[in-house]
Amino acid sequence: MAQYSGSSLTGLESRAEHVPFARADDSLASIVGQIVEHQVPPHAIDGLERLYGSLYACWRFLRLCDPVPPHTWIAYQRDHMVGVLLFRINAGLVRVQTEMFILDETIAAAFARDVFSRYRDASDIEFNAVGLTLPFTRLACQYFAFSENYVLALPDSVESYQQALGKSTRKTLRGYGNRLLRDHPSFEWRYCLSETLPRHVQRALVHQLQEFKRASMTARGKQVKIDAHETTQLLRMAADCGMFGLGSIRGKLCAGSLALKIGDSYVMMLCAADPAFSGYRLGLLACYWSLCDCIKQGARQCHLLWGRYRYKEQLLAVPVSLHRLRIYRSRWHMLLRPMRIACMTARGWSQRCRAWLRSESPSRQGRIVRGCLSVLKRFGSTYHAISMQK
């Protein structure tokens, strides 16, 4: 029985049996895709949040970056929505806008099947910052890991979370928490949903937390650049779905957090403390209390995003590798693009070397590798710029 992908609204149909990605005896044949051009339907918006719980897969956020609606691909399996991807096409390159979620190979193959069947001039599909259920053996593709997103699966209760923490972590949290309350008995932690706070208060809180973050990083010899446009986007999302954690002493803010609710997940956008209280590990305490607040709200998971910090693993967050993925129309089309293959390979080796350098002490070999990385980076950047101009 032929499976169809397409939309009755746009008349886009493609027989899956004519596309080389599908085999009659596997799960791919049971996935029916729908392409809706130049719009994101309401049920797709809900599906993005329900399926992925990621800020960078959420249309409410993506439209702040680019208000022009992209194309939407929606996948169904046995009448259940199993995938939603937003994408744009430019000069034969399909760029997927949906990011920071786990991409299953079957969903990737179904998407490639439908897109390559519908858009005959499309040569490649590019995903940025997606987790992959490796290995990808079905597709003609290249991929490499370049970052990570720390994700914490949340239990049903704060008590269960406390019991799951390591003995040393529980001791640290209890010890510093008791010391903070002993030295500052007026300390109070509470959470507020954004709907209970005026906009000007939300804005003041975000700016104060950013200043705490900047001061803390400066104290460690690092620089933080705060982008005004990104802050505006953050404030708009905070007003829509934010939860603030507030720590105060005698009514003055000394620590806090901002998490955004996407589907049944939270994304921790800010968590910072006044560096004057660094002796109490107040930053760690604030993150822990914020995670407890997410549990109280019934969240399924919390994204702590990128950045390798020990406290994330102390609080049981697990790193999920983020990949850049390029899918080619076929292995033959892939072989016809040697420069593109070389560029992806060079960028992949560059990231592997960077990961190695992070785990090794400075050495002569390290300096040599850094020099090679500089060459690889220039090569990749030059080719990417040329390909964008075509």
Where are these regions (language model features)?
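A conserved beta-strand-loop-helix scaffold within acyl/acetyltransferase catalytic domains
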Residues: 2, 6-82, 87-93, 134-149, ...
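Active-site/acyl-donor-binding loops of N-acyltransferases
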Residues: 2-26, 136-164, 297, 301-365, ...
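N-terminal accessory interaction module
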Residues: 77-79, 94-105, 109-118
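Non-catalytic accessory segments adjacent to catalytic cores
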Residues: 107-156
